[in-house]
Amino acid sequence: MHIEELMWKTIEPKDLWILDKLILSRYLGYKCGPAGTNVPYSGEYIVRPCVNAFGMGLDAKKIFLEKSTDHLQPGTFWCEWFEGKHLSVDYEWGKQILCVEGFKKDSTFVKWDKWVKVFDRMPLPDILKKHFYHQRWINCEFIGNNLIEVHFRYNTDFQWNNNEYIPVWTKDVTVPAGYRYVDDPEPVAGRVGALIK
């Protein structure tokens, strides 16, 4: 069973709101709304599913919106565009234990080039301290200092005590010196494994 599927099967119904990225964005005060509501000003926005058990940025798009969003897919939402580092941070009982930075081309939200351990410190957001102190594992994704996504799990890409994780999208891979290949398939996104060191 996929780790996200297990989370969805075991989460308390009262906690489901945190997994809805539109509701989370509204709680955090971001400029956002569901498909079918007007944006406050013309510009670049991120448009993605409100809920996505697959994760991995599936169906996320950067779109220039004038005003109306009636043309967007139902079940998606728009949110102001953030700039900055993309960090994935693990907390165990509220204490940060891992921070990794993701690197990718601007043309994709799914096929990341690599993730690298970094030493950034990101305090657990107050909204999570208040409502989810009872969760052992919390994984947060940030762009800049902006919380964009929450999972009740840890980052399995670093389960091998590695410092770097390079997703592999094809079986034909040459393993560079200093790396080793691990099978780590993600069928929905098409990942077959990773190079780690």
Roles of regions detected by a PLM:
Residues 54-56, 105-197:
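ATP-dependent carboxylate activation and anion-phosphoryl transfer catalytic cores
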Residues 2-127, 170:
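Active-site nucleotide/adenylate-binding loops and adjacent lid/helix of ATP-dependent enzymes
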